[in-house]
């Protein structure tokens, strides 16, 4: 299934293939533990490195959740996936262009 990879080091947002196996999230975002930040689109979320602030190399970025809320400050790679009613990961409803439009690199 498709997913959206956010790479703040390269300042890139790209579509990638995700197998559906949660262990691949670790590989795609280069982390040992992850957490999820909600987006304003449907049930989409951004998987992030839960220990990003402790990483030796850090690349900062902000996600503009919605116009009337402060930006969410994040560190290192993120992976956008959707979620169905059963809690399973699915392709996100967000588009690459939408995600790009909501990111501010560095903070």
Task: State each model region's role.
Residues 1-107:
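Short beta-rich binding modules
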């Amino acid at each position: 299934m498709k997913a959206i990879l956010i790479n703040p080091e390269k300042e890139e947002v790209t579509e990638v293939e995700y197998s559906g196996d949660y262990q691949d999230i670790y590989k795609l975002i280069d982390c040992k533990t992850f957490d999820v930040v909600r987006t304003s689109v449907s049930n989409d979320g951004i998987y992030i490195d839960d220990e990003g602030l402790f990483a030796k190399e850090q690349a900062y970025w902000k996600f503009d959740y919605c116009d009337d809320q402060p930006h969410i400050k994040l560190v290192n790679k993120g992976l956008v996936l959707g979620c169905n009613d059963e809690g399973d990961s699915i392709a996100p409803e967000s588009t690459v262009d939408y995600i790009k439009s909501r990111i501010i690199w560095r903070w």
